[in-house]
Amino acid sequence: MLLLALAFFFPAGDTQNVLPGKISFYGIQISTFFNHTVVENRGSGWLGDMEISSWDSEKETIIFRKPWSKGNFSNDEILEVEEIFQVYFFGFVREAQKHMSDFQVEYPFEIQVISGCEVNSHRSFDYFMRVAVKGLDLLSIKNHSCWPAPEGVSRAQEIWTLILQYKRICDTVEILLTKTCPRYLMSVIEAGKSDLQKQVKPDAWLSQGPSPGPGLLQLVCHVSGFYPKPVWVMWMRGDKELPETQKRDVLPNADETWYLRVTLDVAAEEAAGLSCRVKHSSLEGQDIILYWGHSISIGWIILAVLVPCLIVLVLFILWFYRRWSYEDIF
């Protein structure tokens, strides 16, 4: 029964340009079983790193988050797939509750499924699925091959045997992945071309983080507001990359751009001459290079603004006082 999760959002990666390499459409399902009666199903559909649809569990309908999220699918086709999901979630919950105790899974537990299809620059397709229970990988499927995760071989084999008992479901999943998904993926790529091809230049700035130890500095390079997601950021000494550079995860901003924080722990006397270099497709080869110690802190900027204002204010007070004193004499 778990395999029907493969059909999530017709099923379907980084999206850099339209078909420059690989682009995937995939659905993410998270089903949380709190007890025998309370279950929460969440789902979302993604084109590369962009969320384009989600599942409304109350209305049991698909929410399309982009004007082009339907691709070239008709309203009747949308209704048809929504009906498939409605039947699926009902059956999925029933079968999971029936069989999870057989596999010694205790409440509360969570089942996560990611599934979809991928197209490469040669327009050939692959489809895939991964299933996890309580955050532990259980099994993976790619094209017509299935293999259990090393940490759950025996349990995965038992579940796979159970799944194969539902032949009609497996046949439906295969059609959705091998026929419906490629058609949907290509149509949504074409419909969302302007969004997928957009380029947004990053902003970058330096700051000092908390000291990692006596005599040490933590240099922080912030890069924000860029799209698409792939970016290269590195601390440098001249033209030499510093392997001690520590990169965090690339995080999403609210406006669908991205943010990255890159740090370097260095002895205070060795900080001079270091720079942070940023490469991104939107920069068209004109890398951003920020030199440590050459940037002006916020405090100095504020001071530079306040000092002239204070001087003007003092001069005005002196002028007003002299004028008042002069008029008082006469």
Curated annotation (Swiss-Prot):
Residues 182-292 form the Ig-like domain. GO terms for biological process: adaptive immune response; antigen processing and presentation, endogenous lipid antigen via MHC class Ib; antigen processing and presentation, exogenous lipid antigen via MHC class Ib; positive regulation of T cell mediated cytotoxicity. One of its GO terms (molecular function) is lipopeptide binding. InterPro entries: Ig-like_dom, Ig-like_dom_sf, Ig-like_fold, Ig_C1-set, MHC_class-I_related, MHC_I-like_Ag-recog, MHC_I-like_Ag-recog_sf, MHC_I/II-like_Ag-recog. It is a single-pass type I membrane protein. The keyword Signal applies. The chain crosses the membrane at residues 300-320. Residues 16-299 are extracellular. Disulfide bonds join C117-C181, C221-C276. Coiled coil: none annotated. Residues 1-15 form the signal peptide. Antigen-presenting protein that binds self and non-self lipid and glycolipid antigens and presents them to T-cell receptors on natural killer T-cells. During protein synthesis and maturation, CD1 family members bind endogenous lipids that are replaced by lipid or glycolipid antigens when the proteins are internalized and pass through endosomes or lysosomes, before trafficking back to the cell surface. Interaction with saposin C is required for the loading of bacterial lipid antigens onto CD1B in the lysosome. This is T-cell surface glycoprotein CD1b4. The lineage of its organism: Eukaryota, Metazoa, Chordata, Craniata, Vertebrata.
